[in-house]
């Protein structure tokens, strides 16, 4: 059975619901979890380079705060369930690659993540990190398709 589960999050409500299910699953099989968040790289196109340094620093600060908030939620859920947990925060424009790398580096034997279930052209245009993980992972991937109709809208 699985002993170490990677739980990637993008901070969405669906992802948060998958994290809760992932922690419950980990508890039921005696596994530990690693929470994971990939923050985007800083990209700006401007001719006013004197503004960039402050903007970049603020972007990094905001990204760290967001990651810390998402990862703290995973750690708290795991602690409440009595499940061992550590967290990983990286910066990457290619979250699926970072997810796969973290799973390997941490010795995970399962990746459990949410899917928004976008289909057709919308799914292709928006891209699906879950789909990319599924097609590139050498590890098993458990995809949680929550009922988005039951989730409350983001404010």
Please name every model-derived segment.
Residues 3-54, 77-81, 86:
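Small/aliphatic-rich secondary-structure junction motif
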């Amino acid at each position: 059975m699985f002993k170490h589960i990677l739980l990637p999050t993008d901070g969405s409500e669906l992802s948060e619901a998958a994290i809760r299910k992932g922690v419950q699953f980990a508890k039921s099989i005696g596994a530990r979890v690693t929470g994971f968040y990939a923050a985007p790289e800083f990209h700006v196109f401007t001719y006013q380079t004197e503004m960039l340094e402050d903007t970049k620093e603020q972007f990094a600060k905001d990204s760290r705060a967001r990651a810390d908030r998402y990862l703290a939620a995973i750690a708290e859920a795991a602690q409440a369930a009595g499940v061992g947990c550590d967290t990983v925060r990286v910066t990457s424009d290619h979250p699926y690659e970072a997810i796969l790398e973290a799973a390997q580096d941490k010795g995970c034997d399962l990746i459990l993540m949410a899917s928004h279930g976008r289909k057709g052209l919308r799914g292709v245009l928006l891209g699906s990190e879950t789909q990319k993980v599924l097609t590139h992972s050498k590890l098993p991937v458990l995809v949680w398709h929550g009922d988005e109709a039951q989730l409350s809208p983001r404010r």
